[in-house]
């Protein structure tokens, strides 16, 4: 049996070695027989290890007290050799003989289970233990009857017969014991074979479990790899779709490029023909360029000569321009009559007459006739006295219909003198409401026809400076705007917290030994365009001191001085020039009414009027002193004359606008203004000198 089991085990091992790897379901199917074999082995081990109930050899059956008593009774003794031997039941189930088990194992049907499973397992599983024989009472015997007779019970005194029976029974028990030992030995060998087979099957099971775990790991790896490959396939499919679209786009682009190439090839051929023609033209042009270079060199030489000549002509122009201005007079007076405003009474005919010039009606007027009626009557006829006629002659008279542009044309030559390096000062003088501020600054913003002298002069200077840059001249402009109120200098360009701090402004020399004057704490703003000047004028209008007077609802109560410092340089010739342009809007000149009742507001107006008249009187005295060539000129008697002293002397050019009202009710103030202007017009302050370096 051991050899056959070994061969079966080898066959089964070879079968397992050559068997393909099965799934988990097959492995579970293989485990079921193995578990049954294990259970049968445990049952067999229990049967083998169960204790035998056979009597030990050489031992004697002990009797109890009841049996001893029965043996003492003579009536119950049996005759020796006539009774049956009592059989001891071991109550041990007997299994089938080993030969039957082996035969059943060999001839039993072979199951379709996994290979390597022996048939011993089913045999042991289906074998049932034999039912134990019922225990017999002591003294009874189960031995068969002798000679066909039913054996009787030996009497108690037949000890020898009983002993023989016991020996016979012991012999039978020994034979049974030997038989059981042989069967036990066979079962032990069979158990050993089954255990070896179980060990082999366990080893194979472990091997299969390891193979199964390996297969599972490989399956998981394959699944992961499959998922990775699936994702890669999707990615590649998406990439393939993108590549296909790109290929389609490239094919479309290729077709377009082919068309463009065809077009470019055609154009290239045309360009080659044009290039050949251009080369021929270039050869011709080179010859022309050579000729033109020679001509250019000649033109450069001529241009330099023309530049020198132009510079000489510019210097001659300046000299003649200045000579013309001197012939007109370094102090000139223009009279301007403002038009009648809406709501004012129209003057009577003949009140203001503008006689034509010497050349006739086409000649601009230079005279003004003002008629003044007298309330006195003749003592003889008691008739009204004739009107008094006052004639005045000036350098130019502007009637009420004159436009701002006409006024500026007359002073544009004077503004040009400032650019040439001559100090220039232009005044606007007259009573309150006569149009001084309108003449200097203009009307409402946004209407170019109403622009005053200041914005027009700045536009003219910027334009001429731009033209002069072509001749090598560069100009810079620095503007300031101050007012003199009650002999106090205020900065009209102050902003923020500096507003109203005009008292801190003082007139000082620019430096030790310098004749140039400057105003401390005042803003000096570089300007280069008209918009910057407009912004400064708008700011000054907001800061200027105004008040209500008897002549005007909103009257300027201070002298405003717009100063523009002009600096020019010709770097190529090393020339420099500089001069100030002063545009002054004087405060209204009015006489005080002796019978005026003074209230709190009238006292302020009184002080303002006194300061204004004092400064205007000083201005007249300064002009007279300059005209008379006096050694002392009272510049310091007024802040106005002290600030303008460099523009009032013999090296300066001065022009005064006398503005008068067309109303008859203002005839007294108009006559006073005209008389003052006539005195100024009669003054001569000498020849002006340009400030050149």
Curated annotation (Swiss-Prot):
SMART domains: KISc
Binding of ATP, residues: 430-437
Predominant localisation class: nucleus
Domain Kinesin motor: 330-683
Record carries keyword Oxidoreductase: no
Phosphoserine carried by residues: 52, 59
Official protein name in the record: Kinesin-like protein KIFC1
Native species: Rattus norvegicus
């Amino acid at each position: 049996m051991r050899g056959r089991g070994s061969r079966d085990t080898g066959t089964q091992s070879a079968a397992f070695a050559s068997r393909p790897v099965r799934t988990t379901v097959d492995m579970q199917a293989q485990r079921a027989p193995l578990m049954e074999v294990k259970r049968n082995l445990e049952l067999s081990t229990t049967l083998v290890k169960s204790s035998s109930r056979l009597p030990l050899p050489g031992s004697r059956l002990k009797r109890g007290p009841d049996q001893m008593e029965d043996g003492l009774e003579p009536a119950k003794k049996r005759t020796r050799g006539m009774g049956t031997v009592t059989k001891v039941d071991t109550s041990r189930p007997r299994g089938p003989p080993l030969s039957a088990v082996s035969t059943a194992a060999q001839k039993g049907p072979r199951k379709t289970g996994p290979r390597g499973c022996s048939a011993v397992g089913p045999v042991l599983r289906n074998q049932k233990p034999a039912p134990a024989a019922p225990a017999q009472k002591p003294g009874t015997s189960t031995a068969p009857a002798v000679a066909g007779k039913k054996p009787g019970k030996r009497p108690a005194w037949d000890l020898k017969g009983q002993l023989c029976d016991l020996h016979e029974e012991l012999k039978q028990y020994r034979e049974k014991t030997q038989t059981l030992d042989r069967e036990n030995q066979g079962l032990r060998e069979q158990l050993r074979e089954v255990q070896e087979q179980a060990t082999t099957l366990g080893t194979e099971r472990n091997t299969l479990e390891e193979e199964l775990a390996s297969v599972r790991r490989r399956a998981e790896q394959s699944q992961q790899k499959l998922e990775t490959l699936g994702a890669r396939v999707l990615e590649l499919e998406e990439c393939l779709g993108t590549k296909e679209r790109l290929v389609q786009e490239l094919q479309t682009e290729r077709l377009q490029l082919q068309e463009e190439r065809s077009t470019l090839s055609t154009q290239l051929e045309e360009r080659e023909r044009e290039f050949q023609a251009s080369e021929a033209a270039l050869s011709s042009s080179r010859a022309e360029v050579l000729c033109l270079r020679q001509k250019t060199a000649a033109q450069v030489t001529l241009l330099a000569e023309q530049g020198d000549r132009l510079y000489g002509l510019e210097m001659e122009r300046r000299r003649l321009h200045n000579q013309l201005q001197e012939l007109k007079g370094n102090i000139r007076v223009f009279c301007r009559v403002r038009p009648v405003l809406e709501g004012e009474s129209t003057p009577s005919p003949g009140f203001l007459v503008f006689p034509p010039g010497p050349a006739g009606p086409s000649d601009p007027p230079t005279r003004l006739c003002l008629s003044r009626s007298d309330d006195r009557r003749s003592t003889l006829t008691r008739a009204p006295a004739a009107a008094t006629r006052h004639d005045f002659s000036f350098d130019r008279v502007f009637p009420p219909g004159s436009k701002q542009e006409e006024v500026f044309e007359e002073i544009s030559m004077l503004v040009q003198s400032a650019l040439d390096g001559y100090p220039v000062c232009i005044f606007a003088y007259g009573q309150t409401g006569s149009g001084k501020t309108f003449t200097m600054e203009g009307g409402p913003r946004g209407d170019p026809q109403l622009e005053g002298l200041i914005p027009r002069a700045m536009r003219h200077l910027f334009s001429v400076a731009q033209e002069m840059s072509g001749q090598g001249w560069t100009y810079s402009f620095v503007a300031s705007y101050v007012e003199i109120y009650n002999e106090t200098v205020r900065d009209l360009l102050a902003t923020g917290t500096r507003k109203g701090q005009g008292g801190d402004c003082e007139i000082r020399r620019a430096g030790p030994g310098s004749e140039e004057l400057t105003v401390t704490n005042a803003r000096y703003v570089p300007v280069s365009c008209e918009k910057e000047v407009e912004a400064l004028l708008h700011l000054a209008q907001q800061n200027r001191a105004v008040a209500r007077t008897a002549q005007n609802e909103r009257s300027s109560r201070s002298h405003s001085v717009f100063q523009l410092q002009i600096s020019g340089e010709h770097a190529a010739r090393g020339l420099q020039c500089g001069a100030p342009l002063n545009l002054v809007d004087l405060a209204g000149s009015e006489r005080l009414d002796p019978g005026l009742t003074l209230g709190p507001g009238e006292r302020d107006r009184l002080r303002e009027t006194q300061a204004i008249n004092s400064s205007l009187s000083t201005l007249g005295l300064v002009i007279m002193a300059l005209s008379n060539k006096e050694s002392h000129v009272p510049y310091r008697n007024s802040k106005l004359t002290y600030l303008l002293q460099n523009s009032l002397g013999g090296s300066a050019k001065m022009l005064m606008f006398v503005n008068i009202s067309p109303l008859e009710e203002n005839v007294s103030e108009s006559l006073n203004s005209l008389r003052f202007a006539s005195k100024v017009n009669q003054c001569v302050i000498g020849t002006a000198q340009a400030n050149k370096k």
